[in-house]
């Protein structure tokens, strides 16, 4: 059985971007391949949870939308957890830094790149549904090829 580093699972309305105001269950994963100083997640403090426990907790909220966030959620086995949640009719969204390709099972991809802060890091995700910029002075022209 797969286990995942979970910082928290909670129900709230999405407060940012396209889905603002829409109820979601947030699954915040631990671990990240970047270390942004402004990050609001203590991604090094988490509890290992198995897939069945995560799904059970999500289903208890009776909400048909989940957003994977972190840390960097693309570091996890999203195919397994995504398949299990999809079997329950749940729409899957992700907020990612874009450095790891996202599996096709994800319905909505928000790319929030930080690669300009990390010269040795490049964007691997080539498609998305929205681009989220979180720091001033970011040169957005480098994302012109991102298919959004």
Language-model segments: which ranges?
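A generic structural micro-feature
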Residues: 19-21, 125
């Amino acid at each position: 059985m797969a286990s995942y580093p979970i910082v928290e699972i909670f129900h709230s309305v999405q407060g940012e971007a396209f889905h603002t105001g829409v109820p979601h269950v947030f699954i915040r994963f631990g671990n990240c391949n970047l270390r942004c100083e402004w990050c609001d997640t203590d991604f090094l403090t988490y509890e290992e949870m198995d897939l069945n426990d995560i799904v059970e907790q999500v289903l208890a909220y009776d909400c048909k939308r989940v957003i994977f966030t972190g840390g960097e959620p693309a570091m996890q086995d999203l195919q397994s957890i995504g398949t299990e949640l999809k079997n329950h009719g749940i729409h899957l969204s992700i907020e990612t830094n874009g450095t790891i390709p996202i599996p096709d099972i994800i319905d909505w991809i928000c790319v929030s790149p930080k690669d300009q802060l990390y010269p040795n890091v490049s964007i691997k995700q080539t498609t998305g549904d929205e681009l989220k910029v979180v720091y001033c002075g970011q040169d957005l022209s480098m994302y012109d090829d991102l298919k959004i």
